[in-house]
Design a protein with these regions (language model features):
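A short glycine-rich, aromatic-capped structural motif
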Residues: 14-68, 85-89, 162-163
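Conserved beta-strand and immediately adjacent loop positions that scaffold enzyme active sites
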Residues: 21, 155, 211
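Non-catalytic surface loops within mature trypsin-like serine protease
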Residues: 27, 43, 52, 124, ...
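Short, P/G- and charge-enriched loop/turn segments at secondary-structure junctions
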Residues: 9-13, 34-36, 198-203
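Short, structured beta-strand segments at or near domain termini in extracellular proteins/domains
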Residues: 208-219
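Functional-site microenvironments in short loops/helix caps that host divalent-cation chemistry
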Residues: 31, 66, 72-208
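Pro/Ala/Gly-rich low-complexity, hydrophilic intrinsically disordered segments
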Residues: 1-7
Length: 219
């Protein structure tokens, strides 16, 4: 795939366990949230794409872990679609198996937004269907294969961080009740797709618009 950002070419790894391409996010500050506060983040690697059904199948095959919801639904089980129907615990189990972890919110947002406080991964232009997957009918729509929207790439070279699927993060949104999800999804309105938008889901939820990507500490 053609990379839009020169930054993305500087450093990257392939995670041996699950074969995921990961991009390097350098240490330093970025502008976080609607208030654009300066927040420091240590260096880390993050999956270039959300975890796919194909990758999750390898995890299931090696561990006998339970299949996700929607696993046999043809709308959601293409090997290169992002895995959905996984709850927070499922995502953590996969991350542990792969030698990775779920991202902290600040890590996720920096990977999505870059350092300049932009509204969306690609800049400040409002989303359209060439940039992201959103606002589809529940009865007819579904997530696209990962990496389909090349123009929606983030400054660091991450794909699908706006729309397509929500992504689980480490933190509680409300302690003991909801976990943070980020990014918006294929069924959401464009107003929800900004890099700073925060939402949540019950940790046990297995929805057809929630998946995840992982991070790994930088050596």
């Amino acid at each position: 795939m053609e990379e839009k950002s020169d930054i993305a070419k500087k450093k990257g790894i392939v995670n041996e366990k699950d074969g995921s391409a990961m991009v390097h996010i350098p240490a330093g500050t970025f502008l976080m949230g609607n208030e654009k506060n300066s927040v420091n983040v240590e260096a880390f690697y993050i999956d270039k794409y959300p975890i796919t059904n194909n990758q999750y199948k390898k995890f299931i095959d090696e561990t006998n872990y339970a299949e996700p919801a929607f696993w046999k639904n043809v709308k959601f089980n293409n090997p290169e679609q992002p895995v959905v129907g996984v709850n927070w615990t499922d995502a953590v189990a996969y991350a542990n198996w792969a030698g990775k972890r779920l991202p902290e919110e600040k890590e996720w947002e920096k990977a999505s937004r870059g350092t300049d406080g932009r509204e969306y991964p690609w800049g400040n232009v409002k989303p359209d269907q060439s940039l992201a997957v959103f606002d589809l009918e529940i009865s007819k729509g579904a997530p696209t294969n990962v990496g389909t929207h090349l123009s929606g790439v983030s400054p660091f070279g991450c794909y699908d961080m706006s729309g397509n699927i929500w992504e689980w993060c480490q933190e509680w949104y409300t302690e003991g009740k909801y976990r943070v999800v980020r990014g918006g999804s294929w069924i959401n309105h464009l107003n929800i797709l900004s890099c700073s938008y925060r939402s949540c889901s019950v940790p046990a939820g297995k929805d057809n618009n929630v998946g995840f990507r992982c991070v790994k500490d930088s050596a």
